[in-house]
UniProtKB/Swiss-Prot annotation:
Natural source organism: Pyrococcus horikoshii (strain ATCC 700860 / DSM 12428 / JCM 9974 / NBRC 100139 / OT-3)
A GO cellular-component term linked to this record: cytosolic small ribosomal subunit
Pfam families in the cross-refs: Ribosomal_S4e (PF00900), RS4NT (PF08071), S4 (PF01479)
Family per record: Belongs to the eukaryotic ribosomal protein eS4 family.
PROSITE patterns: RIBOSOMAL_S4E, S4
Keywords: Ribonucleoprotein, Ribosomal protein, RNA-binding, rRNA-binding
Domain S4 RNA-binding residues, every copy: 43-105
Protein name from the UniProt record: Small ribosomal subunit protein eS4
CDD domains: KOW_RPS4, S4
SMART domains (alphabetical): KOW (SM00739), S4 (SM00363)
Alphabetized HAMAP family for the sequence: Ribosomal_eS4 (MF_00485)
GO MF annotation terms: rRNA binding; structural constituent of ribosome
One GO process term, biological-process aspect: translation
Domain of life: Archaea
Amino acid sequence: MARKGPKRHLKRLAAPSSWYIERKAYKWAVRPRPGPHNMRTSIPLLYIVRDYLGYAKTAREARKILNEGKFLVDGKVRKDYKFPVGIMDVVSIPETGEHYRVLPNRIGKLVLHPISEEEANIKPLRIRNKRMVKGAKVQLNFHDGTNHLIPLTEKDNYFTSYTVLMKVPEREIMEVLPFEKGAYVFVTQGKNVARKGRIVEIKKFPMGWPDVVTIEDEEGELFDTLKEYAFVVGKDKPKISLP
């Protein structure tokens, strides 16, 4: 008999390696709902409340806190304990004045990086692609599954791999960061995950091979990574704080 619908369960041993959870303490893990991020690059909101920040001891306590609307993601109240919170998302707790940005660390684990209240209103969004829509508009599609409409006359200001600094929750574009030589990038995946620096060279390959970028870190060391792993976060220097 065929399976009906998506999977609803997840064993802890099979959970993504990017999650900071105990693997052998319990059998089951919370499976994130389909949403803005895929399972590998996000973590359920319940684990942020309970395991990361320690505001609850049990899943029941964590769900109660979320149902009271005490946690915001990108400036919006989120009550679904399975909501996937991913890279560059901002988690805010108004009652305590805490703000965090979700970023990977050097071993590929998703961590909460403390940020200021002012920075909590800024979210970098990497452009995955763009498409024409009705009404002489162009739709920008971002890495977190969201999109934004711009006038057709502005389409040449936005290209794939560019980063848009978005004001949240208003969803207003504040600045566009081109993917070019000299741009400051943060590596989100691969063996050089969480390293940062300036782009020295962009190597393009034919026949469908992925493009590679050479980056110079703050110590002057050069390293290569795939273009899709390099997330532009500034021009001469980063526009957001990084670990």
